[in-house]
């Protein structure tokens, strides 16, 4: 987890130096970035009701209400720091719109996300282990502990996700175009992630096998 800094020209960013080379003002040190990120992710993805937040069917909550919840946990937190977390997040975990905020993906609670755009990619990818890949080739890809199946727009991202759990990642190539034509709803959460309620096995085109020593 990297610190958050502010560049007068480019705004909030993660790390010691901005892309322009400037060493901006320190906004949040690493340990506070981690605490704030974990707490907000938990609230927006898993337990808004626990903190009395009213969440609509698309995952939106009021930003000021969230800030009050966060401040009860961390006295140093405020809306400005929440915005710094969102705008500097290269993984695009969150979305701000006016006076509302939501998590873009990772939900375990029932959210519809009906205002997300349809994913336009013809091919998408799902990273997994060898054992799980065999099962998915038979029964399809279903969500585990999350509301949606999380697909990647690139092979590299899928491999990265799978490599967290196994030394021999498998990437399943999904015929997203055919799935959409057949009525499977696939939505775009951000530049790297698409979501679907499930992917039946017939849309898995092939599997790509890697090992811990492979570079591609």
UniProtKB/Swiss-Prot annotation:
Its EC number is 2.7.1.-. GO terms for molecular function: NAD+ poly-ADP-ribosyltransferase activity; tRNA 2'-phosphotransferase activity. Pfam families: PTS_2-RNA (PF01885). InterPro entries: Ptrans_KptA/Tpt1, RNA_2'-PTrans_C, RNA_2'-PTrans_KptA, RNA_2'-PTrans_N. The keyword NAD applies. Belongs to the KptA/TPT1 family. This is Probable RNA 2'-phosphotransferase 1. It comes from Archaeoglobus fulgidus (strain ATCC 49558 / DSM 4304 / JCM 9628 / NBRC 100126 / VC-16). The lineage of its organism: Archaea, Methanobacteriati, Methanobacteriota, Archaeoglobi, Archaeoglobales.
């Amino acid at each position: 987890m990297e610190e958050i800094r502010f560049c007068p020209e480019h705004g909030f960013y993660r790390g010691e130096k901005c892309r322009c080379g400037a060493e901006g003002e320190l906004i949040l040190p690493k340990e506070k970035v981690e605490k704030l990120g974990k707490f907000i992710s938990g609230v927006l993805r898993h337990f808004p009701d626990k903190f009395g937040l009213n969440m609509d069917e698309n995952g939106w909550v009021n930003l000021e209400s969230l800030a009050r919840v966060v401040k009860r946990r961390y006295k140093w937190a405020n809306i400005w720091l929440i915005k710094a977390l969102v705008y500097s997040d290269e993984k695009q975990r969150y979305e701000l719109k006016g006076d509302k905020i939501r998590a873009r993906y990772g939900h375990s609670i029932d959210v519809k996300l009906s205002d997300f755009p349809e994913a336009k990619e013809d091919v998408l990818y799902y990273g997994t282990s060898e054992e799980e890949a065999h099962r998915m080739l038979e029964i399809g890809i279903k969500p585990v502990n999350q509301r949606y199946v999380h697909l990647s727009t690139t092979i590299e991202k899928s491999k990265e996700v799978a490599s967290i759990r196994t030394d021999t990642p498998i990437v399943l190539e999904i015929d997203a175009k055919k799935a959409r034509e057949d009525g499977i709803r696939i939505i775009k959460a951000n530049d790297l992630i698409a979501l679907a309620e499930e992917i039946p096995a017939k849309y898995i085109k092939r599997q790509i096998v890697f090992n811990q020593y492979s570079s591609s």
